């Protein structure tokens, strides 16, 4: 099946072949031949300059997010989470489940964070730390990371950012973002299998983590930084994925070109917008100016049901060789209960090419027009 979901994502054949490269010892000199270029290319892809060290954490994006909370929020501090969707809520739940003094500032699904509302909350709550989502996978909304971080710092708080579903598909200019830590993963726009959470850790974050207690072991950023500076992981990594990551990042940086990759994602967002304009009764869910370049959410006409999308459209497209995303389950269930219109999601991240997207959109349109 060709995956047009929002993760995991399509993996190129040559990246799959890289899995056949020889295994190696993660404490052996051979390890450096993989991890040094991996870290160098991650820094280039992030535009991180010399302000961040990328650390690879065994797990997924939520692993790095939990490490950010456990290592950067002291027991006597407060954390405000800003949510524009399901994965923003997850960041809050991570903090709450770890016993942090957390509050969740929620915005309506399909909307970006309102900085004026955020500033009002910052004035009243005076949190020590603020976490938020750069790109909300459940809704296709992208927040203005730089503006949010600037506002958060204006009020004396430390910004923690979840960039799981946008990193590798957009220019995040991390060096000038203001983020204390930027959390992402392998299985989205990097077009690799799941297996690593990636944390871009600033000196500021490292210094604070050294003062915070009760960090656990695998969520202790100071331990990860110690190994990252040696071009290693804290515990034994999936060396097959490391080989693929080494190959893929080199290909992105030195073959495709970073800016070309970013431009391709912008082009595909525009393709979806144009496609939606040609469908009767469908519209983009996210507001213009805050639409993700890696995935799109599309509002269906009134009367379309979850059952039609999951049992009808999705299964019809499966028969044609595509895995369709009928929308984020919890969100669509809530929308249906409230009598609101359903949304579908279209993943166009990583190594999905424009010609692949055209073919999929044509097939998807045929099925949607039957509703």
Cite the ranges covered by each PLM segment.
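Conserved active-site segment immediately N-terminal to the catalytic lysine
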Residues: 175-187
């Amino acid at each position: 099946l060709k995956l047009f979901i929002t993760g995991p994502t399509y993996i190129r054949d040559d990246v799959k072949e890289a899995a056949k490269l020889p295994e190696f010892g993660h404490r052996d000199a051979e390890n450096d031949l993989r991890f040094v270029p991996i870290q160098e290319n991650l820094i280039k892809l992030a535009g991180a300059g010399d302000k961040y060290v990328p650390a690879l954490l065994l797990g997924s994006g939520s692993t790095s997010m939990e490490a950010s909370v456990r290592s950067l929020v002291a027991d006597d501090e407060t954390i405000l989470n800003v949510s524009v969707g399901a994965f923003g809520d997850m960041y809050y739940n991570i903090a709450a489940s770890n016993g942090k003094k957390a509050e969740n500032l929620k915005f309506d699904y399909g909307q970006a964070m309102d900085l004026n509302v955020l500033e009002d909350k910052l004035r009243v709550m005076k949190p020590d730390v603020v976490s938020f989502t750069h790109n909300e996978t459940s809704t296709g909304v992208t927040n203005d990371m730089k503006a949010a971080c600037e506002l958060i710092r204006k009020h004396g708080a430390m910004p923690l950012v979840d960039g799981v579903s946008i990193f590798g598909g957009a220019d995040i200019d991390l060096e000038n973002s203001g983020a204390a830590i930027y959390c992402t993963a392998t299985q989205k726009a990097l077009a690799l299998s799941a297996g690593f959470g990636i944390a871009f850790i600033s000196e500021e974050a490292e210094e604070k983590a050294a003062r915070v207690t009760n960090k656990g072991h695998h969520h202790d950023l100071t331990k990860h930084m110690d190994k990252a500076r040696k071009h290693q992981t804290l515990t034994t990594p999936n060396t097959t994925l490391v080989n693929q990551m080494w190959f893929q990042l080199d290909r992105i940086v030195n073959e495709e070109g970073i800016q070309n990759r970013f431009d391709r994602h912008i082009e595909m967002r525009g393709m979806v917008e144009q496609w939606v304009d040609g469908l009767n009764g469908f519209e983009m869910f996210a507001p213009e100016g805050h639409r993700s370049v890696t995935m799109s959410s599309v509002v269906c006409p009134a009367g379309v049901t979850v059952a039609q999308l999951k049992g009808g459209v999705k299964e019809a497209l499966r028969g044609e060789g595509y895995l369709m995303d009928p929308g984020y389950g919890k969100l669509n269930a809530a929308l249906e209960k409230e009598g609101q219109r359903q949304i579908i999601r279209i993943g166009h991240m990583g190594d999905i090419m424009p010609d692949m997207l055209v073919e999929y959109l044509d097939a998807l349109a045929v099925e949607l027009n039957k509703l």
